[in-house]
């Protein structure tokens, strides 16, 4: 029955009630509108059946638990009784043992009690100490909190009251206002009006005051208004650094002013100021070298770390065979001397070849390199440097590559300027000298005179106790040439010259040029190792694989050992004379090194140009305009280009400057012609010619093109062109002198001087000076010149004439009239 009731009874009873109402509202147009609103209330009624079932189930569980507890209690009681009986039987046996153990246990308990007491006291002390510290911390915190909260306590309480009970406070205040208003209602109207006005005003004032107080308290809570206090956490302060931070500055080989300033954390203007103090004018983007940057950084108190940027270059050049055995090598001999003292003739006699006759103007224009083998198998390599002063740089390079210098001095000419230069170069290179006194076959030859003149330049012969060998020779007849070769070999034995023969080759570029058919050609003197066909060569800014090698006779060779000069083909461009040539293992790395060198060269060149521009700007500001002669130089070999450019730059004066706008090796091209047109330059070709396209441009643009094969002519013509650009000079030449013998008055011309021409010729149109007691008192011109009644243009010496001086009537007897003309004086450099 109960199960049926459970099944039929609903779990919960829900009754829904609806309430409808009408709400009237006003629309935007001002009309009233009624809206029906229905409110539904939902009520739930629960039955008690489920609760009754739950109570019944709970009673059953409690009865079962009680029954189990009673059973357990009975079992425990039985067990305890059994143990008690057992203990009663064992008690007599145990009593003796217990009496002994009791005394021991009592001792232990006493000891334990003492330890426990000590431990308790220690804990008590620690606890008291901790409590004391905690109490102090609490008091300190409380003190800080009180100090902190003293300013904000009242405002925070008021603000919290304002937030929590603002409604009640407002109601109470409104009630107070109403009571104040009702106090004066029973009085007369006037008094009421007066008092009411006052009360009304007072109530308004008090209300406003209360509102403003509440607002001030609220603002003070959040740090606003005049009473508000800003929190310390919201304030931000910046302390200026007390001193400049000094740091390590890493400087590469070149660096711009802006980059240096950035690394030192200073303004670029500081660096510019510092460099101005050091005498350097720079701009913010100017590239400066490592040494200058180091000086500036150290001056500003920074530690400088210099960085070498060519690690790749060092790695490539360092990867070489260094353990190879050294062997004796042939000496490299440079022949130096003055122009036409017989250097090439002597060398050609040694080589048994007549090359000197073909030299233009008797000057060796290129460095020649030859090696000759002696009868006993020994070998000597000769370098022939040009003798002209313009080839100083070439001769200096020759001295660097050489072991022994043979100084050729003509016995009939003695020591000349280039002879002295050659001595200086030899000393600078540290190369020992052997003097060959040439042309001893001439009747005017004087060997003792040469020795005496060289003695003045610290070249002391063995005869005078020195170490320099003097060998008299005749290049024309061959006298003494064998003695000269023996002297060279003797000197080389003293020097003990050795070199690695089998390793990777290295050497120096003696000369280079661009061949129209073969491309870049470089003459290289191998200094160590063996240069082979197919080797990869790094040579200054250029690199390449050796495609072909030729000796000085034009014969193909496959390899060249130490002290052997060879012509090399296969480089990427024309290297500069004097560059080191090195064989490397990897062509790709050689290319990278060459490109790196080109980039660094451009940077350094740019830095130099910018510096020159600034220096020129400041010099031009002080000097004014300077005439410039623009020149484009093209020559057949690099050494000639360098020598000509240097000679032209040395021709510059304060009034006329030679500006080399372009230079290069090879023929004159269309590019050179267009550059000459743009820069208004003259083109100078030294042993080269213009091609067809260049000639067309030169003719069309009427460019000044000049060819030379002798450097003297080139320099003389450039000097003549520069002389034409000089500002002319003028001087006054006296051409006639007349003495005043009498003075006449003329109605038209005023005072007319009757004169006798004592010197030269008096001309009508020339300027004159009037001298009295040899002092110039007037300078002007003639108005009239007459002989008797005729106007004449000139009157010669010893003749009389009448002279009328324009705008001057104070002529007296005894005065002298000096006639002169202004003559232009031709200037030259």
UniProtKB/Swiss-Prot annotation:
Residues 147-160 have a biased composition (Acidic residues). Residues 21-30 have a biased composition (Low complexity). SUPFAM superfamilies: Initiation factor IF2/eIF5b, domain 3 (SSF52156), P-loop containing nucleoside triphosphate hydrolases (SSF52540), Translation proteins (SSF50447). One of its GO terms (molecular function) is GTPase activity. Residues 438-441 are annotated as: G4. It is found in: Cytoplasm. Residues 1-44, 79-233 are annotated as: Disordered. Residues 328-498 form the tr-type G domain. InterPro entries: EF-G-like_DII, EFTu-like_2, IF2_assoc_dom_bac, IF2_II, IF2_N, P-loop_NTPase, Small_GTP-bd, T_Tr_GTP-bd_dom. Residues 185-195 have a biased composition (Basic residues). Transmembrane segments: none annotated. One of its GO terms (biological process) is translational initiation. Residues 337-344 are annotated as: G1. Keywords: Cytoplasm, GTP-binding, Initiation factor, Nucleotide-binding, Protein biosynthesis. Residues 474-476 are annotated as: G5. One of its GO terms (cellular component) is cytosol. Residues 1-11, 79-146, 196-222 have a biased composition (Basic and acidic residues). GTP binds at residues 337-344, 384-388, 438-441. Residues 384-387 are annotated as: G3. HAMAP family: IF_2_B. Belongs to the TRAFAC class translation factor GTPase superfamily. Classic translation factor GTPase family. IF-2 subfamily. One of the essential components for the initiation of protein synthesis. Protects formylmethionyl-tRNA from spontaneous hydrolysis and promotes its binding to the 30S ribosomal subunits. Also involved in the hydrolysis of GTP during the formation of the 70S ribosomal complex. This is Translation initiation factor IF-2. It comes from Haemophilus influenzae (strain ATCC 51907 / DSM 11121 / KW20 / Rd). The gene is infB.
């Amino acid at each position: 029955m109960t199960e049926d009731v459970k099944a039929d009874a609903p779990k919960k009873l829900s009754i829904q009630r609806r309430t409808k109402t009408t709400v009237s509202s006003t629309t935007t147009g001002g009309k009233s509108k009624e809206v029906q609103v229905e409110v539904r209330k939902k009520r739930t009624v629960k039955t008690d059946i489920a609760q009754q079932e739950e109570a019944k189930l709970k009673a059953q569980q409690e009865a079962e638990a009680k029954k189990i507890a009673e059973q357990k209690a009975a079992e425990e009681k039985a067990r305890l009784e059994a143990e008690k009986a057992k203990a009663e039987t064992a008690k007599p046996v145990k009593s003796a043992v217990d009496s002994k153990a009791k005394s021991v246990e009592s001792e232990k308990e006493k000891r334990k009690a003492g330890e426990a007491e000590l431990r308790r006291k220690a804990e008590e002390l620690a606890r008291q100490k901790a409590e004391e510290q905690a109490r102090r911390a609490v008091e300190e915190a409380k003190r800080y909190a009180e100090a902190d909260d003293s300013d904000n306590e009242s405002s925070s309480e008021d603000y919290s009251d304002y937030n929590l009970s603002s409604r009640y406070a407002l109601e109470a205040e409104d009630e107070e206002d109403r009571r104040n208003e009702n106090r004066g209602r029973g009085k007369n109207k006037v008094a009421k009006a007066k008092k009411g006005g006052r009360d009304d005003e007072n109530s308004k004032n008090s209300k406003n005051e209360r509102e403003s107080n509440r607002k001030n308290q609220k603002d003070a809570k959040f740090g606003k208004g005049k009473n508000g206090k800003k929190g310390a956490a919201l304030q931000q302060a910046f302390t200026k650094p007390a001193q400049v931070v000094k740091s390590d500055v890493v400087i590469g080989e070149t660096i711009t002013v802006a980059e240096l300033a950035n690394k030192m954390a200073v303004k670029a203007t500081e660096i510019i100021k510092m460099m101005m103090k050091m005498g350097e004018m720079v701009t913010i983007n100017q590239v400066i070298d490592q040494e200058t940057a180091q000086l500036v950084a150290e001056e500003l108190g920074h530690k400088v770390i210099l960085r070498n940027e060519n690690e790749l270059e060092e790695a490539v050049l360092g990867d070489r065979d260094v353990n190879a055995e050294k062997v004796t090598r042939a000496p490299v001999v440079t022949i130096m001397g003055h122009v036409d003292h017989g250097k090439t003739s002597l060398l050609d006699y040694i080589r048994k070849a007549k090359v000197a006759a073909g030299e233009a103007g008797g000057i060796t224009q290129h460095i020649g390199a030859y090696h000759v083998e002696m009868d006993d198998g020994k070998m000597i390599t000769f370098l022939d440097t040009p003798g002209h002063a313009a080839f100083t740089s070439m001769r200096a390079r020759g001295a660097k590559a050489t072991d022994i210098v043979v100084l050729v001095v003509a016995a009939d000419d003695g020591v000349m300027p280039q002879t002295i230069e050659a001595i200086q170069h030899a000393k600078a290179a540290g190369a020992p000298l052997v003097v060959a006194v040439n042309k001893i076959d001439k009747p005017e030859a004087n060997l003792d005179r040469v020795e005496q003149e060289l003695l003045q330049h610290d070249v002391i012969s063995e005869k005078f106790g020195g170490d320099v060998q003097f060998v008299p020779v005749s290049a024309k007849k061959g006298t003494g040439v064998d003695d000269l070769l023996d002297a060279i070999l003797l000197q080389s034995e003293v020097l003990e010259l050795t070199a690695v023969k089998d390793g990777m080759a290295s050497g120096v570029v003696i000369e280079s040029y661009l061949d129209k058919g073969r491309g870049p050609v470089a003459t290289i003197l191998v200094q160590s190792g063996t240069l082979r066909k197919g080797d990869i060569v790094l040579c200054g800014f250029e690199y390449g694989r050796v495609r072909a090698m030729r000796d000085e006779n034009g014969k193909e060779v496959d390899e060249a050992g130490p002290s052997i000069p060879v012509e090399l083909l296969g480089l990427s461009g024309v290297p500069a004379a004097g560059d080191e040539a090195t064989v490397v293992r990897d062509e790709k790395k050689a290319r990278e090194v060459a490109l790196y060198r080109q980039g660094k060269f451009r940077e350094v060149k740019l830095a130099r140009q910018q510096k020159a521009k600034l220096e020129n700007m400041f010099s031009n500001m002080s000097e004014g305009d300077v005439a410039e002669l623009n020149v484009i130089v093209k020559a057949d070999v690099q050494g000639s280009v360098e020598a000509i450019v240097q000679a032209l730059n040395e021709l510059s004066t304060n009034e006329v400057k030679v500006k080399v706008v372009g230079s290069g090796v090879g023929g004159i091209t269309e590019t050179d012609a267009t550059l000459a047109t743009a820069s208004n330059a003259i083109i100078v070709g030294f042993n080269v010619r213009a091609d067809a396209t260049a000639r067309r441009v030169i003719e069309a643009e009427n460019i000044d093109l000049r060819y030379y094969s002798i450097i003297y002519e080139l320099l003389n013509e450039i000097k003549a062109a520069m002389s034409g650009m000089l500002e002319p000079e003028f001087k006054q030449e006296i051409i006639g002198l007349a003495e005043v013998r009498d003075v006449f008055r003329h109605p038209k011309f005023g005072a007319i001087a009757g004169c006798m021409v004592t010197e030269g010729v008096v001309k009508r149109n020339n300027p004159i000076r009037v001298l009295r007691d040899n002092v110039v008192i007037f300078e002007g011109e003639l108005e009239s010149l007459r002989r008797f009644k005729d106007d004449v243009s000139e009157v010669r010496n010893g003749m009389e004439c009448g002279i009328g001086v324009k705008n001057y009537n104070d002529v007296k007897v005894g005065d002298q009239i000096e006639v002169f003309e202004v003559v232009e004086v031709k200037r030259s450099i």
